[in-house]
Amino acid sequence: MAIDEDTVSRIESLRRLRSSLNDMEGSQVTLLGDVMLDRYHHGYANNLNSIAPVPVLKIFQTDESPGAAAHIARGLNSIGLDVDFHTFVGNDREGKAIVDMLTEDGIAVTGIESVSDRHTLVKIRFFGSRESLLEESQILLQADRGPLEQIDNSMSDKLANNAMKQLENSCALVISDYDNGAVTVASATKLIGVARKNAIPVIMDP
């Protein structure tokens, strides 16, 4: 499966974090950030549309995975770190899918707030190649689906206050901001202040 630039950047962030925390396996990390569902459609693009010069994608496979801060949570968990994860999802199928996949990975989801009447952000990527001609597919289109309005800052305040409860027991604070409302300047400043007071390393993934 082709890897886009956002995923490469997140992988590099995890590698740097693993290097920093290499001797702290089994420790807890506090993570605050935005989440989204990454959906990948794979298919063959053999023909052009009859009314516009765009490829017609014949989809044969669809994959989904937790993205953004949820992707970081999975990476931290995979290197032996307990993740105290704080974020929010919409009360919809996509939000439930994120929570279910994190639960299957053994990541605690008690810090994930479900927001009624709100859609979870979904990044939909379409990959295609010419059948029997190209082995490597390429991205043809990305479509983003989610809420049009920003969530109230009170949600970020709530997440930060919840994260504060276990922060002193963590070996690091990770903040992953995708400008979707889980992180604000005020909430990040509050958490970073407590982390510095307790000599806890802070890693930002803006």
Residue ranges and their predicted role:
Residues 47-51:
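Flexible glycine/proline-rich, aromatic-decorated loop/lid segments
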